[in-house]
Amino acid sequence: TGITPVGKVAWEQGLPTASYKESRVNGQQAKQLTLNADTVLRTGLMDGLELQLGWAGPTWTQVKHTGQTHEEDGLGDVSIALKKAIDLNDDKLSMAVMAEAILATGDDGFTVDDDIYSVGSTVDYQYNDLVNTSITMRYEVQDGNWAVTAVPTLGYKIVGKLSGFSELVYRKAESQNYQYQLGSGLIYAL
């Protein structure tokens, strides 16, 4: 829920995120492993409002199906977002809302195919100077189909301007199975 101060830039570089999915293709089991590392640049536009520019980054995928292994790699989509802090008049509890557009600019096989527009909110609780927890709820639409995502996160300070996060991503889209992902990353404030 933190907002980058006006005139400052924060660079969020995600550590490689792994996702694993099993499915059935033509009655045969298929296993897919994906590794991805994303980047977000944040800058303050005015007090309590920031601009975020993101890139889904490089991605590697391995699919095992009918005894064969197929690997691919490519570059992901870009995103633009505005995030607004909501003043709750509380020293430990904070909230922010965000509107985002993910633009389908990535390589074939590594893009969302159609642009995604979303709104979301995050509530964060700061336990102490070193640890915080948060929950993010996001509602999105892509080509007329809706989805909801919930992301509980644990944040921790490492040293100086370096901090980290670990998160569980739960997503449910129309006519799709539930999706789960684990992620972690580092944040270095410039």
Which residues does each predicted region cover?
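Transmembrane beta-barrel domains of Gram-negative outer membranes and organellar outer membranes
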Residues: 1-190
